[in-house]
Amino acid sequence: MCYISRMEFPLDLRFKLMALGSRLTVTDARGTLVYYVKQKAFKLKESVTVFADEGQTRPLYTINADRIVDVSARYRVTDPGGSEVAVVQRLGMRSFWKAHYQVHQGGQTVFVMREENPWIKVLDGIVSAIPIVSLFSGYIFHPAYTLSRAEGEAPILRIVKRPAFFQGRFRIEAMHLSATESLEVAVVSVLMMVLLERMRG
């Protein structure tokens, strides 16, 4: 297990069932809640709030899309004071087949997120549409994504869909990290990507 900036990896992501809009809990390797994520329902533009607690009393970040559903939408991450922390951008046409995102800070690209094998997600979506068989799709196919600091560099985080009935589960695994590296912005960016990719299937 790797302790980075109060987060002990791996991190487990679980979507709550029967909720208007997505609800996502993030726990660390000890089972401690790291984030509670709420995606607002019935919004033309994506709007997400990341809280430090499940009671939703301590907001940490707000993520808002810059436009109504668009292949190249940018998602602005701000702190409680409204200051920009980062911008997550889905790279348009390239993301139709294989998910590809960039994370920007101060106009510079600081992280790149990529899907490992797009065929896995395609098969997962096909099987999920078959009655009865769809109940087991979550145990057969596990789409995975990586986050690195630049194109072609070794990934520092890996995100994998986990086996689960009826609910979405993902895991964020630490890979090539320095002992003092802070990844809070990276993890929050991953949460936005997971919300978007889950909606895509």
Protein language model features and the residues they cover:
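Low-complexity or membrane-interfacial segments used for flexible interactions
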Residues: 2-61, 65-73, 80-85, 91-201
